[in-house]
């Protein structure tokens, strides 16, 4: 018999009327902001499918803005996301895209720019019941849910990099639940995503960056 989570039946604790359009949207944005050094100065949201049609009426816009500011799905400040973003000096925009149809119906692209001028673009899908999937980072197709502690390594696709990552984690006693490599092409930019059911110890990022073929390390913990 298939296991059914309580979230599949009732959905998560959340602010807003829909687990797909509010809680899921908030979680996508919350995960996205973990991938860039704060503070953010701008966030631009492109919405697809049903997100594009109902984003204002269902509170998807407030949920996305709250998530990008680091609010959890049950944080009552989400109701005042617009005012809080203005107070913080965070510029934002929402652009519905109803022409691209070959895409999951609850999809959003989030373009973030921080105070240092660094830009990152993340695509996420809201699957229902507060479950989400991150499917693209800076144009590279990836796949992770944010349900585990995630280590995201941005690297050049060179021999020995994955072995370096595995050794560092093994030496620090990290139990790997999932480990996958995503790349643009041979020798180009690649992402290794490691998911673990334990929190990642301090200092892991610095040790990984000792490899000259590793450009960046992001830790996304729920």
Task: Identify the residue ranges that each predicted region occupies.
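Catalytic-loop motifs flanking and including active-site residues across diverse enzymes
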Residues: 24-28, 60, 161
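Acidic-glycine-rich active-site phosphate/pyrophosphate-binding loop
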Residues: 1-6, 37-41
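A structural-propensity feature for long, helix-poor, extended segments
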Residues: 44, 48-87
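Conserved phosphate/anionic-ligand binding catalytic regions in large, soluble enzymes, centered on
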Residues: 11-29
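Generic secondary-structure signature for well-ordered alpha-helical cores
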Residues: 11, 15, 33-38, 69-73, ...
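Contiguous domain-boundary segments centered on the initiation and propagation of an alpha-helix
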Residues: 69-120
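A conserved regulatory-domain signal marking ACT and ACT-like small-molecule sensing domains
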Residues: 92-96, 122-222
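An N-terminal amphipathic alpha-helical segment
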Residues: 30-41, 46, 130-131
